[in-house]
Amino acid sequence: MKIKWLKNIFILFIILIFISAFSSSYSSLNLDKLIYVLALGIDKGDNNQLEVTFQFSNPLSPDSAGSEKAETLSNTVTASSISSAINLANSYQERQLNLSHCKVIIFSEELAVEGISEEIYTLINDTQIRPSSNIVISKCSAKSYIKQTKPEVENLISKYYEMFAQSSKYTGHMPDATIGKFFNSLICNTCEPFAILGNSSTNSSSVHGSNNIENIGVAVFKNDVLVGELNSNETIAFLNMRNAVDRFLISVPDPFNHNNYIDIYVTPLKSRKV
């Protein structure tokens, strides 16, 4: 009798283990119920509101899995905060927004000059936002930045957003700036944050192509307020002082012919001792 009672207890225990192990799968979200945000743009709206733009791949596009460039979609929501904008966007989307694959976060210059600490804290506290997401301050609106970004080589725009900042290592024209680094500098008593400076290339005479966005320079902050910017040459000097650039090319005026420039390619002669 006692053995039979112990056997029943053992069977019940096994059943409870299976129930607890598989019950979470019923509450989890399937992949076909999610839509992944690739880029997040934040602009200043009217009446102290924010205009938040979400860019994501079109899951119904036939080119999403092919060799052609995958189609992207974007929606803009006006709300009092980023969290409210996400909640509002979910109310009319067929699928739930997921930010775990967001590669870049863009703030407009208009918003950044007023301070973005509240938005930074909101994003950092969101478990879906990766600290490695690039942060860009756009001289045009964040919505326009997203709309005009059209990679020339990469088929997947998510790959472009992930890779473009890596050119800082061999050009020095932009910093490697992420929201995680920005937040750490924001809470540091001896540091100041900085971000990638973005702009529409339609305002530039030096860049032409299908991608109408250029990322050149550094957006300089005092605490959470945008206070200035560095051009390409100043950015090279800034990154060189921080040992954050491997090699770079600069053009200097020819001292013997003021109409010409000399290109100087700078690389480390020896490895650093410290």
Tell where the protein language model's regions lie, with residue ranges.
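Membrane-proximal alpha-helical signals and transmembrane carboxylates
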Residues: 2-274
